Amino acid sequence: MATFKRLLAWISDLRIAIGLLLVIALASALGTAIPQGELRESYLEGYSDKPWLGFVNGSMILRLQLDHVYTSSWFLALLAWLGLALILCSWRRQWPALQAALQWIDYQEPRQLSKLAIAETISSPPKNESIDKLAAHLHQQGWQVQQQPGRLAARRGIIGRAGPMLVHLGLVLLMLGAVWGSLGGNRLEQFLAPGRSLDLLNRDGNSHLKLTLTNFGIERDPAGRPEQFRSQLELLEPGQDTAKLHEVSVNHPLRFHGLTVYQADWSLAAITLQLGRSPQLQLPLRTFPELGEQVWGLVLPTNPDGSEPVLLSLTSEAGPVQVFDATGERLASLRPAGPTAEVKGIPIRIVDVLPASGLLLKRDPGVPLVYIGFLITLVGGGLSMIATRQLWAVGDPENECLHVGGLCNRNLTGFANELPSLLAAAVPQQ
């Protein structure tokens, strides 16, 4: 039993909790520095030639579960340890301290008050009128007063003692919500072109929501840089005849029945062009990372046998569309809805470019718990700032004086400076 108590004391030690917080903060920094949730091959290939920090290669990242830090077994174990430490600290220290603070201490002798952090003796009338006046004045100032014949005890700000326990409770709820969201949540990144739909299935494999992108717009500044992206969405639930219309933009997500849709990215999905007198052709675009970070295009043959291909590349839905041959020489520059240009004897006209909206869909069941925990933590932190002040007074009719003592868990100097004015208002000096 003694060993078990020592173990509990060690787990709930404040230094251990601070160390755990530092380790968790460091682990969170690792999760920020290393891309999370990518394919296994991307870590093996991306960190083989250039190890992270010079020695952490892809295999080590996978072994240490650094590719999914926030759901790794060791990170969840750290959170569980910290949560247990907070619970034990509240149980072994904060709760007994709160219970002790709620109990009245009845000091009856002046010598008991002389041992307190603040002790003072003032002259008073021979009767106990000073005790009555002090009790009435403290009541007016918002103090709780317990008066006995010839003495009194008073306290104020006792609610501040509950602050640390609420902080611990809020942190535990916050961590539980984060773990619940990591293990029980879903995340999906999807590019949708206007007119395309996405069926979201429940655990039984049945559709519970159909999401359709009706329109996607990109707002650009005068220099052509994107400033805002807006997606017009239709949400249709099973059994409903009318879809609900919603708009999603950057920093303005859509929340719908526990599902959150973010405007996360954009892309170019397809290009519509016309070759000579041919019908309009809509061809898919793909990215060319070797040409730049946001470069899309397609390779278009100019002969029936597929020879002499040309590359059509562009960086925005507004164009221009650059045309290059196999040697890298630029042959033409076209604009959507612009004039026709002849490339290797073929008239080419760009009709339009179809942008795609990059949507991030998240279902996080732990979000309400995180919000509640955060709110409780804020309330507890605010209450912890309230100073708990205790005051005792014992009358001494024989010596015509009043002995006063006090304690304060925060800003003791301020309480000591306030005490003379408090006593002067209650027991005016002659």
Curated annotation (Swiss-Prot):
The chain crosses the membrane at residues 14-34, 72-92, 162-182. It holds the Pfam family ResB. GO terms for cellular component: plasma membrane-derived thylakoid membrane. Disulfide bonds: none annotated. It is a multi-pass membrane protein. GO terms for biological process: cytochrome complex assembly. It comes from the Bacteria. Keywords: Cytochrome c-type biogenesis, Membrane, Thylakoid, Transmembrane, Transmembrane helix. The keyword Membrane applies. It is found in: Cellular thylakoid membrane. The keyword Transcription regulation does not apply. Required during biogenesis of c-type cytochromes (cytochrome c6 and cytochrome f) at the step of heme attachment. May interact with CcsA. Belongs to the Ccs1/CcsB family. This is Cytochrome c biogenesis protein CcsB.
